[in-house]
């Protein structure tokens, strides 16, 4: 998406500079660790390490290697502006990031271009991915609480996994604690998220998620909660899955 200088014999660029400016502003917001996306930036290192370590255990890689995911195909569903796509590309994975928001994809492409990273970003829904495409790692991070049919969505995700692949899902538990912290606390008190970002009745309990996965002949191999410590102002992995949690699933033997 970079603008090229006009030269004799070269047609003028058809890219609208105003659009570039708009996408640049959005990209800066997504990637500003102190701005509106600060909560996501705080939790992102934990998501990255959890996914990386799970993948390295599955595929017998050295998690300390800077190219530990080399040769692995990864699909990030609902990728936003690429906060997961970029670090996993740097670790060697061949990453495809998809998002139904054209604006998010434009911002993601712009930031990847500035970072000199080759990432295949697509403005599509998971249902539009060619079923012949298969991936070693399928990510559905903070997505299922926004879909209309969790079972159908996960079925489509599972269909895109290689037989030896893994799926990593992150979402929010459904209980009064998650209502108090993820909605009242995050959206109304702390104002980390715009009001209305989440609907509590669309949250998914760990038992429900595991049931969906089991119906698809997948088994949960790893799971972890993510807990925020307000005194330390940081997130940590925890056995406590009352609010935020992640699961790794693979094909049942």
UniProtKB/Swiss-Prot annotation:
S-adenosyl-L-methionine binds at residues 47, 78, 99, 141. One of its GO terms (molecular function) is 2-polyprenyl-6-hydroxyphenol methylase activity. Keywords: Methyltransferase, S-adenosyl-L-methionine, Transferase, Ubiquinone biosynthesis. It catalyses: a 3-demethylubiquinol + S-adenosyl-L-methionine = a ubiquinol + S-adenosyl-L-homocysteine + H(+); a 3-(all-trans-polyprenyl)benzene-1,2-diol + S-adenosyl-L-methionine = a 2-methoxy-6-(all-trans-polyprenyl)phenol + S-adenosyl-L-homocysteine + H(+). It is an enzyme of class 2 (transferase). Pathway: Cofactor biosynthesis; ubiquinone biosynthesis. It comes from the Bacteria. One of its GO terms (biological process) is methylation. InterPro entries: SAM-dependent_MTases_sf, UbiG_MeTrfase. Its EC number is 2.1.1.222, 2.1.1.64. Belongs to the methyltransferase superfamily. UbiG/COQ3 family. O-methyltransferase that catalyzes the 2 O-methylation steps in the ubiquinone biosynthetic pathway. This is Ubiquinone biosynthesis O-methyltransferase. It comes from Rhodopseudomonas palustris (strain TIE-1). The gene is ubiG.
């Amino acid at each position: 998406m970079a603008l090229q200088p006009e030269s004799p014999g070269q047609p003028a660029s058809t890219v609208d500079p105003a659009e570039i400016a708009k996408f640049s502003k959005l990209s800066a917001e997504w990637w500003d660790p102190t701005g509106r996306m600060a909560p996501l930036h705080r939790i992102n290192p934990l998501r990255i390490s959890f996914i990386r370590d799970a993948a390295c255990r599955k595929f017998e890689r050295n998690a300390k290697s800077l190219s530990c995911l080399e040769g692995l195909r990864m699909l990030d569903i609902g990728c936003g502006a690429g906060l997961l796509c970029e670090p996993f590309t740097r670790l060697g994975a061949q990453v495809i990031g998809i998002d139904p928001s054209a604006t998010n994809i434009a911002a993601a492409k712009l930031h990847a271009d500035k970072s000199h990273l080759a990432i295949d970003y697509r403005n599509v829904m998971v249902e539009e991915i060619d079923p012949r495409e298969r991936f070693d790692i399928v990510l559905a991070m903070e997505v299922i609480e926004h879909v209309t049919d969790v079972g159908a969505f996960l079925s489509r995700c599972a269909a895109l996994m290689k037989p030896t692949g893994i799926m990593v899902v992150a979402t929010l538990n459904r209980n009064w604690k998650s209502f108090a912290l993820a909605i009242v606390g995050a959206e109304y008190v702390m104002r980390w998220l715009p009001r209305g970002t989440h609907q509590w009745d669309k949250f998914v309990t760990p038992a429900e998620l595991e049931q969906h996965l089991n119906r698809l002949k997948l088994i949960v191999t790893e799971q972890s909660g993510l807990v925020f410590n307000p005194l330390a102002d940081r997130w940590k992995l925890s056995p406590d899955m009352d609010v935020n949690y992640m699961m790794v699933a693979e094909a049942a033997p």
